Amino acid sequence: MNLRRFLKYWLPVLAWMVFIFIGSTDLLSAEHTSRFIGPFLRWFAPDISEATVASVQLVVRKCAHLTEYAILAALLFRAFRQSQPRVGRAFAMSFFIAAVYAALDEFHQSYVASRTGSPWDVLIDCIGALAGLVIYWTLSGNRKSKIGNRK
């Protein structure tokens, strides 16, 4: 693999993985994200209850899980498709790596004082990865080839 191909296809994958890792630190813990989600919601709806703020924050955080792993899986699929002629194999490898990274990410969070690791979050991450793969595959023009075929 030449440097140009690596930079074009694999550097975005690695950069996104670093972004996810940094997000797993205290930097994006619930305590820190509540500092901007709560005030925004109170500005938007001054009479909002604390319970509603907490619920919205939870939904936003879980949507972030879905989105970050959808992007990771799509980037992996894009990179694998450059060297892997079989769509199904690229799809499976992308999902597997995203799922393993999700599990490792939650394991990492279990060692961060302000975070907790959760198997439910791994499930949400895997659902996001699957959604990202399906969306990318559909939008990229690969939809003409069925999963398992060569093109």
Report the location of each language-model feature.
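"…centered on the first transmembrane helix and the immediately adjacent amphipathic helix/loop
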Residues: 1-74
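Catalytic tyrosine of NAD(P)H-dependent dehydrogenase/reductases that use a Tyr as the general acid/base
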Residues: 57-61, 101, 117
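Short, basic, low-complexity termini and linkers enriched in Ser/Thr/Gly/Pro
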Residues: 142-151
